Amino acid sequence: SDSLSFSFINFDQDERNVIAQGDARLSGNNILQLTRTDSDGTPVRSTVGRILYSAQVRLWEKSTNRVANFQTQFSFFLESPLSNPADGIAFFIAPPDTAIPSGSAGGLLGLFSPKTAQNESANQVLAVEFDTFYAQNSNTWDPNYPHIGIDVNSIKSAKTVRWERREGVTLNVLVTYNPSTKTLDVVATYPDGQRYDLSVVVDVTTVLPEWVRVGFSAASGEQFQTHNLESWSFTSTLLYTAQKE
């Protein structure tokens, strides 16, 4: 179909439209926990979890030169007993058969293989990451502070903005893609109005196949935190764009 729209006000136990990968699971309180916790709810080391929406999304259509105009809204919060919690959560778009790469725990956020994490020609993923861990000795590709980043086929973000991780506080995020300007815009806000903006110009037809899946990924390495998705809505519609030169 030319358009797709869905909305989760929260996540109940019987969520048939979600494909869970790795350690992701629905917790009893209508929250989707992307990374593993022990029996008393404390986050653990070396965990990766992802979820995908079951239906595929038509991102573009070569035969008609149409490209999707899409918008997604989601909210999440992070919790950890540590002073330097890790690693982060990302909204991502990838080919429909996408799976967790081997060795992608920790700073690779469940999205990239260690061998090809910065080799753009080896990847097909567009992601918006919320990265809380930035040790320069290990995550050499990161800026030296917590950040929001837009990743285009690489763990080294195309654009980043400094971000404040707030323990247990919900961050609301809006991501939009405009195919006529080829702009991906991210706006993230905390309840008190603190706001973060970033955008990048990206032609999705050069990054991803015509059909994709959309979802979330999160990971922890030696340091840890919970990655809790509270709500998620997504809508996309194919639009005619100007003929390519």
From Swiss-Prot:
Glycans are attached at residue 119. Optimum pH is 6-7 for hemagglutinating activity. Activity drops rapidly at lower or higher pH. It holds the Pfam family Lectin_legB. This is Mannose/glucose-specific lectin. Hemagglutinating activity is not inhibited by D-arabinose, D-fructose, D-fucose, D-galactose, D-xylose, alpha-methyl-D-glactopyranoside, carrageenan, lactose or mucin. GO terms for molecular function: D-mannose binding; metal ion binding; toxin activity. Mn(2+) binds at residues 129, 131, 142, 147. Belongs to the leguminous lectin family. Homodimer. A carbohydrate binds at residues 87, 107, 138-139, 221-223. Thermostable. Retains hemagglutinating activity after incubation at 70 degrees Celsius for 1 hour. At higher temperatures activity drops drastically and is lost at 100 degrees Celsius. Mannose/glucose-specific lectin that also binds derivatives N-acetyl-D-glucosamine and alpha-methyl-D-mannopyranoside with even higher affinity. Has hemagglutinating activity towards rabbit erythrocytes. Is toxic towards brine shrimp A.nauplii. In rats, induces dose-dependent paw edema.
